[in-house]
Amino acid sequence: MGLGDYSHCRQRMSRGLYGVSGRAALWSPVFHPVHRMPCGTWRIGIEVPEHVRASSPVLEHLRRQLERAFQRAAARGRARRAREAVAAVAAAAAAAREERSRTRMECALARLRAELLELRFQNHQLARTLLDLNMKMQQLKKRQDQELASKPQSPQDKEMNSECGSA
């Protein structure tokens, strides 16, 4: 499509809006967003002269209110994003603290397990030593009983042995 295809639009704009002279300056065509060409619909232009703005204080007041509302909305958005960032940092710090705490507890548990294994090993060694001593005592007692049985004993020795054995 060339520029010549829109000659009918130029003719309509030159004679005014639908033949009404003097009003064409306040109206501008709506442009298609992709091609930036007039689409055939009309609306009031955005560029309003200063004397028109001053003549409508209500519109100026509304414009200022909208401007302030947009500024407040933008500030709230920035504040919300800042709060979310702070919350994310706090959550990350809490997760890091939790991880350090969990690591410390795991280390403490590992030390306690190692100590428990050491104590079990020592307990096993002490039990074996006690069994060895008990067996030696039994062997010594048997040997002593054999020696006493092989010796002739006097009546006094028998009384002594019976007293020691009963005591």
Curated annotation (Swiss-Prot):
Region (Disordered) spans which residues? 140-167
Transmembrane residues, as ranges? none
What is one GO biological process annotated to this record?
response to testosterone
| Domain of life (superkingdom) | Eukaryota
| Expressing tissues | Preferentially expressed in testis both in embryo and adult. Expressed at much lower level in other tissues.
Protein name, as recorded: Alanine- and arginine-rich domain-containing protein
- Source organism per UniProt: Mus musculus (Mouse)
Report the gene name: Aard
